[in-house]
């Protein structure tokens, strides 16, 4: 309730109000009480309640009625209310009793005294005064009490109102009540009550305030919501109070201020969030605990199983011992019997020997018993060790769970399986070891039995079973200590340690077989060491090196705790960050270096022995060929996905993979025992597509070149690999000269560098028949060459893959090193490195571009060496497969995620198909590269195939440039650093290595630094959107939307920054073009097409398009509209030529929406085409601007402009140009058209001078003074007349009504100008506006009207007439005046419209025809007055012209019937009024309300105002629309003048009061002002464009003049009050300006 504010203001008044009425009553009583009362009532000096009752609707009753007692009880305690009321009542009662009772007693006493004393007069008077004083004192006291009661009531009221207001605002009483210390429940109850009461208040107050009525709907909605606030707040408060954590917050907020419902809801939301987080934590904890519990259960079960297995084994061993003992006993019995017989026979001879033999047997038996005991001990020890291992596993599991709760489920599964397998394998090993020993003693039968027993034993998820044969090599001594078991298990773990995902995928057979091979190795080492291995001693094992992902793991006899950790780290290698990955790569590289060549041969032996070990990573028992095929399948779908929309590319990519397979298979000799060379090739290929592309291109080259590139797929793959190799090449080649974006990717990566190299190399590569094939061939040769050269330099071919691998790994760790190495090893190795690394770091880019020529030079040499080196390269590639065991699987993931259809685009494909493919693919590939994170061990060269030059450039044109600006140079930013292992993680700069970050940050600048030579200017202007525009035309063809958007963005910048400059620059050309249209109209496109064509040029001819920047010069020379020389390249512009280029004009077209369409075509034509001197609004035009400056006093100064963007043309002229183009002129006589042309030219010149005077102060008027303005003006007029003729011929775009004749009354005008030059001060004032004697005016009018007849046809040339000299304009005006005089009656109906353009006429007709008629009449009267003035005498010549024009106007009057109302206010009528007004100038102020023109002002003042006001023409157009008046077109000269100085006249329109000062203006002055006032017709022209009439075309030029000079007048129109200070210019100043304006006319 906002009403409380009113009571607050009222309260100050009402609280003290009631005393004053009593004061006034007391004042009437006696002087003494007055003094007393004044002393007492100083505090209440406000008006009395009686005199000032509260306003209606704000009385206390208004607030008192709606408040029920229940609320008062709530807000103010009942006790307090009762106390206040009782105290107030007691005070009142006591005071009243005292007053009245005392008065009554005193009266009795006085009566008694009077009766007793005899009623003396003095006593009576004194007693009366005393009584009065007592009454007054008592009354004052009563008044005070009443005031106190009223104040208390009002305060209570105000409290109630404020409380209701607070309720209405936030229902925030809750906090206040809390501050009062009340409970939340009571607060809620009160709030509910208050809400109800508040609704009651609303219902009552709605009827009393309109504001409340306007907001009834909102308040009803509020009322509906308030119903729910009670319950809501109850719940909220209960919820908040229930949470102690938030109580402090609620308290602080309640103390600080009343929190809104939103804050409370926010609190609740926070509480819910906290609870949700707690619940989530609890759930997570529960899950973790459950997982732990399950793990413990599994461990417990495993322990139980192990226990049962061990017990079973102990039983078995015991049974075996029993069997052995029984057999021995039997043998001993048998042997004893036989020996007894023999002994009996030979007892005599052999008795000592027999004893000895029996002793030996006993010893043997004892030894065997000891052995059995030791075996028993070993078994017991193994049992203990197994139990300890189980405990260790538990601890490890707990540790793992603690570290990685998230990964726990997966790890728990895998670890449960591992632990079970470990325990089982250990138990089985122990079982197997015992059977081995027993087998050695008892025979092979035991072996079979034990193996059968083991197979029969229960097995749970065993990853591998140890064949007894695998353990046979271990001597029985190794089992005497249980330390051997951890060694074997560790060895098995090290072998089988792999990502748990792969283990899950692995089949039991493959892993069981995999374990066989590794166990042989420890068996050999154990055979070498017959003694038990100590725990610290590590067995002699091969290093299990995984260069791509895995650290080489050495098998050692360390406890299983550490080994399990190692296996876990190996399984977690996938998730390692780039730093860990770098470390792994470095270690792998060091190991590779140590291994050297032996690693390859070792790998061969390993493949024979432990190929299954590596299959643990790949999980395939099949041949390497099958494994490779799977990798290639992963490849194929990846490429397939990348190029599914582009089947050709997909087919290529598949072809490339299959090619590599087939080719490597063809080279079976190189495949050796490795499966297929393509196996290693496939693995490596994904490790780095650069290396793949090398191996593929190399193998393919060996295959395809040896096979002659049999299939297109091979050729395409060759091109792909070549492009991969030459991604750095092709972009460099491509960007310079390809019209089709070959470079797209490379251009993105290294667009700038590529530009320079591209031009140089682009010609070479493009000159070839199918550059794709040749380049692919060259690159395919070069790739093997690179590998060859590197291999040669390193001394052998096989290590090349290691070098490639190490280099690829180094390329991530130290790509810069690899780049330097590649440079050292030659451009070929450099290309190889760039391929293998895929990095194509800026160095590799530049080197690749350089390498192009070098590769071409060495092509023949290297081709010869290709066949030689190709085989070792393949071998190396094959070796690489096993180094990168998981590359196939990784590559599948990457292949799925990498949509690089490595774009092995068919050379045979049409450029268009390639274009379509290429456009979409590069972006996807880039995105995918970004998605990849450089965590994997294998350096994945993101194999951007720059399709041969045709399509790279298609996408190149916009994407590379945009990326250059954005700095997203993916190619330069080392795409290769993104390894295959972590495709899921984005290669964001945060994830990249610091090197990679550096490259990523550098790449944009590097790319920006280099631009194609044709785009040289764009280099300086890096961030201008025009760079993107200027790249190439195909951009618009393929992606018109993108280019259009870019263009519009650029234009938006220009609009924001230099819109005004562009407008100003364009307008002079528009003016010029209007003059020039006649000559070049044939060559010009039509207005609708010209604008679009220009935009297409700006988009399409981007090579030529101007890159617009803030510091750039927008003006350049146009050699051709369609063949645009690069606009930015030309900083300077020759003065005489049209400076605006088509591209800029198109931009300006978009910028200047209102600008006439004709101007766009006109701008392009240089002014030289015109034989006559064109009026150049620009500073340094070849045409003599010497006479164009308006200020004679200022010496001409060269104008040096940093940018052509800012034109010297006034905004009024620009708007005139805008409006004039679309006008539909009415046909009139040719003479009138000529007059209008001259008027237009004169106005333009005057405007030019005004603008130039403001801007540069250049003035060639001095020359005119020396030479005589007459000659210059005559020459210019005569020269301009043919222009008008040409305009008439060529201005197809002009409306027929605007067509103007070439005939000119310029001679008379010139004569009049000469007269004006020679006139005295007073005469000059009149002559400034060219209004000469009435006779001259009549002559001009007589001549003019015939011309005005043609104006109907050529009304569009009113603009050109505006370019006419002021003399021509004056002649027209004078002619019109004479005509108006002769045709006053007719003109009252018709002629006024005739002189105005159709648009202006319509505006005048529709807006204020009656007003215009009145104004025209006044103007006519004033003109008559001016004619009477001595200064008007020279106007006779102009009057003659006007008389001539009258005849023409009479012809115009017929079509102008609709505008007759405006014409009724002809200048003749105005002159009449002026004649009357001379005498009645004093009375004119009264008429000023009707008379809009500042006729009182001298012509010089008006001219000055015109000159000064001209700079505001832009406002004039806007305001001119407001000034539909200026009705008299015959007064157009006055209107023209008024257009210049029209701000005054317009203010007169609005104010009219100001006129009396200006009413004294001479006829010329008034006409000038009227003429100035016409600038409104410019807007009229816009509006009148609807009106086809434009009956007085002469007036339209005058309006245009006013538009040029009108800006001030426009301000006067809109503001009315603001008039230029120059309105009161002296006649001399006005004369000077007019002379300057005349001189400026060419």
Swiss-Prot record:
Coiled-coil spans in chain: 279-330
Domain of life: Eukaryota
Region entry Disordered, spans: 21-51
Entry comment describing in which tissues the protein is expressed: Exclusively expressed in the testes.
Keyword Isomerase among record annotations: no
Pfam families attached to this UniProt entry: BioT2
LRR repeats: 161-184, 1310-1333
Keyword flag Lipid metabolism: no
Keywords assigned by UniProt, alphabetized: Coiled coil, Leucine-rich repeat, Repeat
Remaining remarks: Oncogene that drives tumor growth via increasing proliteration and cell survival.
PANTHER family named in the record: COILED-COIL DOMAIN-CONTAINING PROTEIN 7
Protein name: Coiled-coil domain-containing protein 7A
Native source species: Mus musculus
Gene: Ccdc7a
């Amino acid at each position: 309730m906002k009403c409380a504010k009113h009571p607050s203001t009222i309260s100050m008044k009402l609280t003290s109000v009631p005393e004053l009425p009593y004061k006034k009553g007391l004042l009437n009583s006696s002087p003494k009480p007055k003094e007393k009362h004044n002393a007492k009532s100083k505090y209440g000096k406000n008006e009395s309640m009686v005199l000032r009752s509260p306003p209606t609707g704000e009385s206390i009753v208004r607030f008192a009625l709606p408040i029920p007692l229940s609320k008062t009880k709530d807000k103010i305690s009942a006790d307090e209310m009762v106390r206040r009321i009782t105290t107030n009542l007691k005070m009142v009662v006591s005071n009243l009793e005292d007053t009245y009772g005392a008065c009554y007693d005193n009266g009795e006493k006085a009566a008694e005294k009077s009766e007793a004393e005899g009623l003396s007069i003095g006593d009576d008077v004194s007693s009366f005064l005393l009584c009065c004083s007592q009454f007054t004192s008592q009354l004052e006291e009563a008044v005070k009490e009443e005031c106190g009661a009223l104040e208390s009531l009002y305060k209570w009221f105000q409290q109630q109102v404020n409380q209701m207001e607070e309720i209405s605002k936030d229902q925030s009483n809750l906090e206040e009540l809390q501050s009062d210390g009340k409970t939340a429940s009571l607060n809620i109850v009160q709030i509910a009550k208050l809400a109800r009461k508040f609704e009651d208040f609303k219902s009552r107050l709605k009827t009393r305030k309109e504001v409340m009525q306007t907001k009834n709907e909102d308040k009803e909605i509020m009322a509906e919501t308030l119903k729910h606030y009670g319950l809501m707040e109850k719940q909220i408060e209960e919820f908040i109070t229930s949470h102690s954590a938030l109580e402090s917050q609620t308290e602080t907020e309640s103390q600080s201020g009343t929190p809104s419902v939103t804050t409370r809801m926010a609190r609740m939301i926070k509480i819910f969030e906290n609870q949700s987080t707690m619940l989530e934590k609890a759930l997570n904890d529960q899950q973790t605990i459950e997982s732990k519990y399950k793990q413990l259960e599994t461990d417990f079960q495993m322990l139980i199983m192990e226990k049962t297995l061990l017990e079973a084994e102990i039983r078995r061993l015991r049974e075996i011992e029993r069997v052995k003992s029984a057999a021995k006993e039997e043998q001993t019995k048998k042997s004893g019997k036989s020996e007894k017989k023999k002994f009996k026979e030979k007892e005599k001879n052999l008795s000592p020997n027999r004893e000895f033999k029996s002793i030996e047997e006993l010893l043997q038996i004892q030894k065997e018993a000891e052995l059995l005991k030791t075996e028993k001990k070993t078994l017991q020890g193994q049992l203990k060790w197994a139990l300890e291992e189980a405990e260790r596993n538990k601890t490890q599991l707990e540790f793992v769970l603690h570290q990685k709760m998230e990964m726990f489920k997966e790890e728990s599964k895998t670890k449960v399986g591992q632990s079970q397998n470990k325990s089982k394998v250990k138990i089985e090993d122990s079982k197997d070891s015992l059977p081995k020993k027993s087998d050695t003693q008892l025979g092979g039968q035991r072996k079979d039995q034990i193996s059968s027993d083991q197979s029969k034993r229960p097995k749970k998820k065993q990853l591998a079973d140890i064949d007894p044969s695998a353990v046979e090599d271990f001597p029985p001594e190794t089992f005497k200590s249980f330390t051997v078991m951890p060694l074997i298990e560790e060895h098995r773990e090290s072998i089988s340690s792999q990502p748990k995902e792969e283990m899950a995928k692995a089949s039991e057979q493959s892993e069981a077989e995999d374990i066989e091979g590794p166990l042989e190795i420890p068996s050999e080492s154990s055979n070498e060491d017959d003694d038990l291995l100590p725990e610290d001693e590590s067995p002699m094992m091969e290093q299990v090196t995984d260069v791509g992902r895995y650290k080489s793991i050495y098998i050692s006899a360390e406890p299983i705790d550490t080994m399990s950790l190692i296996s876990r780290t190996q399984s977690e290698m996938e998730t390692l960050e780039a730093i860990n990955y770098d470390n792994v790569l470095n270690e792998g590289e060091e190991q590779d270096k140590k291994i050297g060549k032996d690693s390859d041969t070792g790998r061969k032996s390993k493949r024979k022995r432990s190929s299954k070990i590596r299959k643990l990573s790949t999980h395939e028992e099949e041949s390497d060929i099958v494994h490779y095929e799977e990798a290639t399948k992963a490849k194929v779908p990846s490429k397939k996905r990348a190029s599914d929309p582009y089947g050709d590319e997909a087919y290529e990519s598949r072809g490339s993979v299959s090619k590599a397979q087939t080719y490597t298979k063809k080279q079976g000799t190189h495949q050796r025992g490795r499966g297929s060379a393509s196996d290693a090739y496939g693995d490596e290929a994904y490790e780095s597509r650069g290396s793949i592309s090398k191996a593929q291109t190399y193998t393919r080259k060996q295959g395809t070149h040896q096979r002659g590139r049999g299939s297109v797929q091979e050729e395409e793959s060759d091109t792909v690999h070549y492009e991969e190799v030459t991604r750095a090449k092709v972009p460099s080649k491509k960007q310079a000269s390809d019209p089709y974006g070959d470079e797209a990717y490379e251009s993105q990566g290294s667009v700038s560098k590529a530009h320079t190299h591209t031009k140089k190399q682009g010609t070479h590569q493009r000159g070839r028949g199918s550059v794709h094939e040749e380049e692919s061939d060259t690159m395919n040769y070069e790739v093997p060459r690179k590998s060859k050269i590197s291999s040669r330099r390193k001394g052998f071919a096989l290590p090349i893959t290691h070098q490639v691998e190490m280099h690829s790994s180094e390329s991530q760790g130290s790509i810069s090193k690899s780049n330097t190495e590649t440079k050292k090893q030659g451009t070929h190795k450099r290309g190889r490195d760039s391929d293998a690394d895929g990095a194509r770091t800026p160095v590799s880019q530049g080197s690749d571009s350089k390498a192009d020529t070098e590769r071409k030079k060495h092509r023949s040499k290297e081709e010869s060496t290709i066949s030689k080196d190709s085989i070792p390269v393949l071998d190396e590639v094959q070796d690489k497969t096993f180094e990168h065991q998981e590359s196939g699987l990784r590559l599948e993931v990457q292949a799925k995620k990498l949509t690089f259809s490595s774009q092995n685009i068919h050379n045979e494909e049409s450029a268009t198909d390639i274009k379509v493919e290429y456009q979409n693919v590069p972006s996807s590939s880039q995105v995918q590269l970004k998605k990849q994170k450089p965590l994997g061990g294998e350096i994945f060269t993101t194999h951007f195939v720059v399709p041969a030059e045709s399509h790279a450039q298609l996408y190149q044109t916009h994407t590379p440039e945009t990326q250059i600006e954005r700095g997203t140079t993916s190619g330069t930013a080392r795409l290769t650093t993104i390894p295959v292992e972590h495709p899921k993680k984005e290669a964001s700069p945060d994830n990249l290595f610091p090197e990679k970050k550096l490259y990523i940050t550098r790449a944009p600048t590097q790319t920006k630094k280099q631009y194609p030579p044709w785009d040289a200017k764009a280099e300086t202007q890096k961030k201008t959107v025009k760079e993107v525009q200027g790249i190439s035309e195909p951009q618009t063809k393929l992606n018109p939307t993108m280019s259009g958007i870019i263009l519009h963005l650029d234009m938006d910048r220009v609009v924001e920054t230099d819109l005004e400059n562009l407008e100003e620059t364009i307008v002079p050309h528009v003016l010029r073009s209007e003059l020039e249209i006649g000559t070049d109209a044939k060559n010009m496109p039509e207005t609708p097409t010209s604008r679009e064509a220009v935009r297409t040029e700006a988009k399409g001819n981007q090579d030529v398009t101007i890159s617009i920047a803030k510091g750039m010069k927008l003006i350049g020379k146009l050699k051709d509209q369609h063949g645009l020389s690069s606009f930015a390249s030309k900083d300077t512009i020759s003065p005489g030529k049209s400076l605006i280029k088509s591209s800029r004009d198109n931009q300006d077209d978009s910028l200047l929406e209102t600008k006439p369409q004709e101007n766009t075509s006109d701008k392009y034509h240089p002014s030289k085409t015109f034989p006559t001197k064109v009026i150049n609004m620009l500073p340094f035009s070849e045409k003599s601007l010497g006479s164009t400056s308006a200020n004679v006093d200022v010496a001409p100064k060269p104008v040096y402009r940093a940018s052509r963007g800012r034109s010297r043309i006034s905004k009024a002229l620009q708007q005139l140009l805008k409006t004039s183009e679309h006008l539909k002129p009415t046909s009139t006589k040719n003479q009138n058209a000529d007059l209008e042309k001259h008027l237009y030219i004169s106005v333009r010149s005057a405007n030019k001078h005004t603008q130039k005077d403001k801007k540069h102060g250049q003035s060639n008027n001095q020359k005119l003074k020396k030479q005589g303005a007459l000659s210059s003006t005559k020459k210019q007029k005569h020269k301009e007349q043919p222009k008008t003729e040409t305009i008439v011929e060529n201005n197809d775009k002009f409306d027929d009504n605007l067509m103007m004749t070439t005939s000119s009354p310029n001679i008379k005008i010139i004569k009049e100008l000469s007269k004006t030059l020679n006139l005295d001060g007073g005469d000059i004032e009149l002559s400034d506006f060219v209004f000469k004697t009435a006779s001259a005016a009549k002559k001009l009018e007589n001549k003019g009207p015939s011309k005005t007849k043609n104006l109907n046809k050529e009304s569009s040339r009113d603009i050109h007439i505006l370019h006419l000299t002021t003399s021509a304009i004056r002649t027209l005006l004078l002619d019109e005046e004479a005509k108006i005089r002769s045709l006053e009656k007719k003109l009252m109906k018709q002629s006024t419209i005739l002189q105005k353009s159709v648009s202006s006429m319509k505006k005048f007709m529709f807006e204020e025809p009656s007003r215009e008629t009145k104004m025209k009449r006044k103007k006519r009267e004033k003109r008559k007055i001016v004619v009477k003035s001595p200064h008007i005498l020279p106007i006779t010549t102009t009057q003659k012209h006007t008389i001539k024009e009258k005849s023409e106007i009479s012809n115009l009057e017929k079509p102008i019937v609709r505008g007759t109302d405006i014409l009724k206010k002809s200048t003749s009528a105005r002159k009449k009024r002026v004649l009357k007004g001379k005498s009645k100038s004093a009375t004119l102020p009264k008429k000023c309300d009707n008379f809009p023109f500042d006729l009182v002002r001298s012509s010089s003042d008006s001219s000055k105002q015109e000159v000064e006001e001209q700079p505001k023409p832009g406002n004039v157009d806007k305001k001119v629309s407001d000034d539909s008046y200026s009705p008299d077109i015959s007064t157009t000269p006055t209107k023209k003048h008024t257009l210049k100085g029209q701000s005054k006249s317009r203010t007169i329109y609005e104010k009219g009061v100001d006129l009396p000062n200006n009413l004294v203006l001479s006829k010329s002055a008034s006409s000038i002002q009227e003429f100035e006032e016409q600038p409104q017709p410019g807007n009229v022209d816009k509006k009148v464009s609807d009106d086809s009439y434009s009956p007085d075309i002469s007036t339209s030029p005058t309006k245009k003049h006013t538009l040029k000079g009108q800006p001030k007048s426009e301000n006067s129109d809109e503001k009315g009050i603001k008039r230029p200070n120059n309105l009161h210019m002296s006649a001399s100043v006005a004369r000077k300006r007019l002379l300057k304006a005349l001189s400026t006319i060419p």
